[in-house]
């Protein structure tokens, strides 16, 4: 199992507009301590939207 203090934890990215959780990725906590936002394709919307890290 992963440690709670893992440097590269798994995070889930959810679409800001439709709230669907579309992507799972990893991030480096030292470089990005805040929640990350990426512009990715949302299959439900059919276009690129902002996806924000969920907890």
Curated annotation (Swiss-Prot):
Family matches, as InterPro entries: Ribosomal_bL33, Ribosomal_bL33_CS, Ribosomal_bL33_sf, Ribosomal_zn-bd
Keyword Ribosomal protein assigned: yes
Classification via PROSITE patterns: RIBOSOMAL_L33 (PS00582)
GO biological processes: translation
Keywords: Ribonucleoprotein, Ribosomal protein
GO cellular component: cytoplasm; ribonucleoprotein complex; ribosome
GO molecular function: structural constituent of ribosome
Top-rank taxon, per record: Bacteria
UniProt family annotation: Belongs to the bacterial ribosomal protein bL33 family.
Protein name: Large ribosomal subunit protein bL33B
Organism: Salinispora tropica (strain ATCC BAA-916 / DSM 44818 / JCM 13857 / NBRC 105044 / CNB-440)
Gene that encodes the chain: rpmG2
């Amino acid at each position: 199992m992963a440690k709670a203090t893992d440097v590269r934890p798994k995070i889930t990215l959810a679409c800001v507009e439709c709230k669907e959780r579309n992507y799972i990725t990893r991030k480096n906590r030292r470089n990005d301590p805040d929640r990350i936002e990426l512009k990715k394709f949302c299959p439900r919307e059919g276009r690129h939207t902002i996806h924000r890290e969920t907890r």
